Amino acid sequence: MEPEHSNYDLKNHPTSVQESTLNGSAVTDPQFGNTTNSLPSMNGLLNHENSFASQQSLSSSAFDDSEIVTSTANSTVVSSALSTPKIDDAQNSDDVRVDGTRRSSRAKRPVYRDFSYTEIDEHEIPIPKKRKSKPAPKQKKSVASDDEDAYDKRHRFSINSASGTEIRTSLRSSKGKSVNYNEQEFYDDFEDEEEEVEEQVEEEYEPIIDFVLNHRKRADAQDDDPKSSYQYLIKWQEVSHLHNTWEDYSTLSSVRGYKKVDNYIKQNIIYDREIREDPTTTFEDIEALDIERERKNMLFEEYKIVERIVASETNEEGKTEYFVKWRQLPYDNCTWEDADVIYSMAPNEVYQFLQRENSPYLPYKGVFYNTRPPYRKLEKQPSYIKGGEIRDFQLTGINWMAYLWHRNENGILADEMGLGKTVQTVCFLSYLVHSLKQHGPFLIVVPLSTVPAWQETLANWTPDLNSICYTGNTESRANIREYEFYLSTNSRKLKFNILLTTYEYILKDKQELNNIRWQYLAIDEAHRLKNSESSLYETLSQFRTANRLLITGTPLQNNLKELASLVNFLMPGKFYIRDELNFDQPNAEQERDIRDLQERLQPFILRRLKKDVEKSLPSKSERILRVELSDMQTEWYKNILTKNYRALTGHTDGRGQLSLLNIVVELKKVSNHPYLFPGAAEKWMMGRKMTREDTLRGIIMNSGKMVLLDKLLQRLKHDGHRVLIFSQMVRMLNILGEYMSLRGYNYQRLDGTIPASVRRVSIDHFNAPDSPDFVFLLSTRAGGLGINLNTADTVIIFDSDWNPQADLQAMARAHRIGQKNHVNVYRFLSKDTVEEDILERARRKMILEYAIISLGVTEKSKNSKNDKYDAQELSAILKFGASNMFKATENQKKLENMNLDDILSHAEDRDSSNDVGGASMGGEEFLKQFEVTDYKAEDLNWDDIIPEEEMERIEEEERMLAAQRAKEEERERREEEERENDEDHPSRTYKRTTKSITKRQQRREEMVREKEIRLLYRAMIKFGLVDERFDTIVKEAELQATDPKRIYSLSADMVKACDEAVERLGADDTKNKQPRKAILIEFKGVKNINAETVTLRVKDLTHLHRAYKGLDPLKQIIGYPIRSVHSWNCSWGIKEDSMLLAGINKHGFGCWQAIKNDPDLGLHDKIFLDEAKNDKESRYVPSAVHLVRRGEYLLSVVREHPDLFVVKTDQPTKRKYNRKAPTKSSTRQTTLDGSISNTKKSSRTKKKKEEETNRGDETSPEGTVGEDEVEEEPRQAEPPKRALRSNSGKAASNKRTTRNSMKTHSAMDTLTAVAALDAELDNMSNEKAKEEVDHVKSENGESVNEPNTEDLSLETEENTTVSDISPLVKNEA
């Protein structure tokens, strides 16, 4: 039984009605309410079968009272009638009804038009395609409907207006949550079955709430009950925002999704009421709430504006429908709408769609050149560039790109930030289309934050080209590929000219995008390609492109290696750039290299500076404001230094470098705000009232920078300035956002967590005329790239970036073309902290770009190392100003009495007009600003910096903490034992209740710190299990202060959890080499623990350590056949593999740099980690990735054969048991690289296998082999017998444990392999070798005259597994 429906009468309802007719009647704009003359009728153009006047009732604001009423004329959607109570409203007493629809089950096949909107001959106008007609489905009538209309069951709403006319609007969308018949041709043969399925679906359909957008109070409401006194604006599933309706709670309570209404009431109405009734709430807070609500309402109105028409289609009735993309919504929210309705709303978008469908600039209509035409300079701005007037230097940039294209060369557009690189690039693409008939497709890859700016530039400067923004989720991108890429579903002819996308979607959809041949590739912020080993670099390098352009304002950021990567991407193999130039000790040869490089690069890099080409741009000045730390900051700073004393005074190799870097990051956080550490804010608020004033005071007074910022913003606000605040740390932006709210400052925010659509709204809102926004909070990396915020004239760098170029990019957001005011930049700096030294070192980096790009290097130029900070530099940074932290100060008093004028008067002024690159002439003045006095912090010792009493205090705290932990764990252990004992006696009452157990478990979990687990995990995957290498792992993980029992427990639990995860997912077969995703688990709150790595590598490393037990790893050689390497740029054999294993055992898996630098291993010239990669031919192997693969393979061999090592001695004459038999008596030859020639050996009989095994059993009659007793005594005296006993004992053990899982070796397996090695190393004579091998065999009771060999071949492919390799020789014992 269906619920009742009531008609909603619009005659007396106060609504903004859009009355539109296609024959020239008046049109009321749905947004602004102004009446204008409508455009001419589209009936003749679209060749509709029926012309009709349409009227639509649309909401002009979020508070519009318009209703949408469902019609039943020839439709397939069953309108679920809902019993609706009367609304006791003075203005309207009619019933309110809910309208819900489902998406179309018809295929979304676009009908493409090949005609233009204007001046088209009648015979050229194609008739829209019609679907094959189907029998009309059975109609269901709504019960208790006043007019007893037959509601449309296909996919329509009927909007009844006051005049009685009706507009039919398609309600299909692109999402398929119901049955969807995607291929119409397939189902044409099964119409009867389709009708039956549709009818079944229709009977089950009911309206579903998608979102609750807004609420309003009823005029006749007597109280504030959210369920009886309010109406709610509902967005329905599968339809656009055009069909949003206002509904009562009682009406919605019977609709699917009504819980969303309850959630909305809690999160909005009740929360809003609590805020307004709170006595501590200020007027500014209420104003902020109202502004935010209004902003959301404006955004909802944006969702009703047509942004683009994607496709068109003709339904069964001959009516045209448009697939519409709505403004600010992604492609997965596109819906099918009636063409006449859309034309009345957005005639310009319809015109643009028809123009695109029959564009003269379709890619397949372009011209193909066998040879590039000669270059002709553009003397003035072409007529087809109509977006505005380009400047002379921009026209020069277009000519430069055109010159490179005619020569079939690529380049780097490296103009300083703010000079319009985006406009130049877009105009050049327009030049290719209009002047050279190169219609694309063109690919533009940009950062996500710059997408809105690029979209705006493309729409403004190239409106006649078809540009697509390829972003969004998987469904959105699928819609783009289906409707926007090709002219038809069966055609591979592209219909777009420009595709705009981001780095992330290049990686996600590289398969689809790489199938297209691109005429031009432009990459914005191209310094993302500075790492030639990154996935983005490799993916874009494989794209098929005719020409490429890199766009970056900072072509050099750190070192020459990054420049080499960019140049190699553009011109593979054409340039070789040395990245090891030392600027500290320049010489004549290096100067010649630099000048030669500059001359060679000059034609391919175009760089102009603002001061040289844009004289009208206002100036920019930078001031460094130094401020003291607060008392809370000082205390945290000292504690971090003191508690990390071991790391500060420990090793300064690669492992220590990471620890020091972590300390530097922690100190940078302290320099910003102590609230960045968990629990700091709560600790300060203890004993204080949780009032608004106390919260605000804590945020300000506990950070010196916040005190300065508070005073500075008050003055800037008073003087009418607008401010951009940049910080590296997103959590710092959270604190700043809370401060802005408490102060009542209107602000916007942009960081890496903000979606693209919200970013665009925030930027537009800030740049809008008369915008109320005072501050824009931005992260340095996400907000410092490519966006235009020139409506602000003040920039505050709250904390400096490691890379000075990132800060310059941030400043350029305001200092760019279009800026009308002088730009002030304030850089905050905490005194006597690591920030000061980092800033000074960062400044020196910029000389590198100055030298290469602008002036070249002279003997007077100075520069520090351009590589990343090493351990010594990090140690010097940490020591800078550290001693002042332990001196008594009155910083807090200074902060409370801070005088802003005094701070500004003593600020360090820095003229930033000579930013990166310096002046194009005369660089001496530029170089002088980098001449800084080095602070010789390395002369100090940490014992001199940190007072002894501080060390004693910290050590006492650590001892107390360790004792407390041990006591807690002992108590828990006893309770656990009691619980286990209690389980044996069910009648005994437990002393602990379930609640107490839960609390105890919570306390245990709280004690497990994430840092400890991560450090332990990293150490274990380097060295193995804690049980075997406790001291090494504890030292590596820096857990000396942690209770050993705790370390053992964590290690065992981690291994157990990983084993269970691998076994649970069916990945416990270690021999399976098929590619699969990593098994990542969460262990005690720590995520991304690789279970397979722990299960395999950690245990393999333990096997390796056990194999070396009692032996000198440097004197061991692999005595087992292993596969050889291929295409490595060095001689690599068994000796190198043996040393690699020894290095892994000594330094840890993955520590390739330490292994390379170890002189005892002799691998310095065989491992290539830092070699330049200018082209494929010069890439040296092995690199780190090859060593990882080789190391894992060798560890798997150790796992299979733990006795594979044999002793290597320096005196061959003493190795009587290691000589190789002459070639005549043995056809096997083993070389140092591991390759083995064919050999012959008779198969071993089953009986003799059992005899050998039985001999092993006799060694240990109890069933276990006492390997220590058997092997220890004769290890050095009689090596052959030791080997025999070891292997036979192992065979006996394997027989009892894994009898059929592993093949064992006899003594001769090892002896033959050793003999093969010795023959190659010592070049023994065949006769001498044969005698000694015969002697060894006779001692072991083996036959000398019967070699017993069989054919044996080893695979040497890279994917060969250990299990594929047969044993070397299996002789009879």
Swiss-Prot record:
Q: Where is this region: Disordered?
A: 1-110, 123-159, 955-1004, 1210-1373
Gene designation per UniProt: hrp1
Q: Name one GO molecular function term.
A: ATP binding
- Which Pfam families does this UniProt record tie to the protein? Chromo, Helicase_C, HTH_CHD1_Hrp3, SNF2-rel_dom
Where, by residue number, is the motif DEAH box?
Answer: 524-527
Record-linked InterPro entries: CHD1-2/Hrp3_HTH, Chromo-like_dom_sf, Chromo/chromo_shadow_dom, Chromo_domain, Helicase_ATP-bd, Helicase_C-like, P-loop_NTPase, SNF2-like_sf
Upper classification of the source organism reads:
Eukaryota, Fungi, Dikarya, Ascomycota, Taphrinomycotina
The organism is: Schizosaccharomyces pombe (strain 972 / ATCC 24843)
Q: What name appears for this protein in its UniProt entry?
A: Chromodomain helicase hrp1
Keywords assigned by UniProt, alphabetized: ATP-binding, DNA-binding, Helicase, Hydrolase, Nucleotide-binding, Nucleus, Phosphoprotein, Repeat
Asked whether the UniProt record includes Nucleus among its keywords, one would answer yes
**Residues in Helicase C-terminal domain copies:** 708-869
